[in-house]
Swiss-Prot record:
The keyword Transport does not apply. Belongs to the NusB family. InterPro entries: NusB-like_sf (IPR035926), NusB_fam (IPR011605), NusB_RsmB_TIM44 (IPR006027). It comes from Macrococcus caseolyticus (strain JCSC5402) (Macrococcoides caseolyticum). Keywords: RNA-binding, Transcription, Transcription antitermination, Transcription regulation. It holds the Pfam family NusB. GO terms for biological process: DNA-templated transcription termination; transcription antitermination. Signal peptide: none annotated. The keyword Flavoprotein does not apply. Involved in transcription antitermination. Required for transcription of ribosomal RNA (rRNA) genes. Binds specifically to the boxA antiterminator sequence of the ribosomal RNA (rrn) operons. PANTHER family: ANTITERMINATION NUSB DOMAIN-CONTAINING PROTEIN, N UTILIZATION SUBSTANCE PROTEIN B-RELATED. GO terms for cellular component: cytosol. SUPFAM superfamilies: NusB-like. This is Transcription antitermination protein NusB.
Length: 130
């Protein structure tokens, strides 16, 4: 399974978790996206990383939203930003790859203009990362 597919799975799993009116476990959400007995280890790492670091990620994202509140963003954009910020801050994946993947995820799962916004926010996070 490619990392691109894994990122898509992670986005879908995180969306499922955030979209449920009742509590749903990561395992149950994953079963909706990745059919057992298959397993997507990279998606699992991303999902657990985003969930465990969510408050820190939100703190890193929020200053770059320019007159927006994180909770006012549509869910998929918020999830793409969290996932990408997690990769930027806590993995050794190349920054250009992460931003490119985020832009592609936004083009695939969000509205027509979201990718520009996401690209801008991630660029600011990179500038202020050090």
């Amino acid at each position: 399974m490619s990392r691109t597919e894994s990122r898509e799975h992670a986005i879908q799993i995180l969306f499922q978790i955030e979209n449920e009116a009742h509590e749903i476990s990561v395992e149950d959400a994953t079963r909706f996206i990745v059919e057992p007995p298959n397993r997507d280890v990279f998606a699992d790492e991303l999902v657990h990383g985003v969930i465990s670091k969510q408050n820190e990620l939100d703190d890193k994202i929020t200053p770059h939203l320019k007159s927006w509140a994180l909770e006012r963003l549509n869910k998929i954009d918020r999830i793409i930003l969290r996932l990408s910020a997690f990769e930027l801050l806590y993995t050794d994946a190349p920054e250009k790859v992460i931003v490119n993947e985020a832009v592609n995820l936004a083009k695939k799962f969000s509205d027509d203009e979201s990718y520009k916004f996401i690209n801008g926010v991630l660029s600011e996070i990179i500038k202020n990362k050090a």
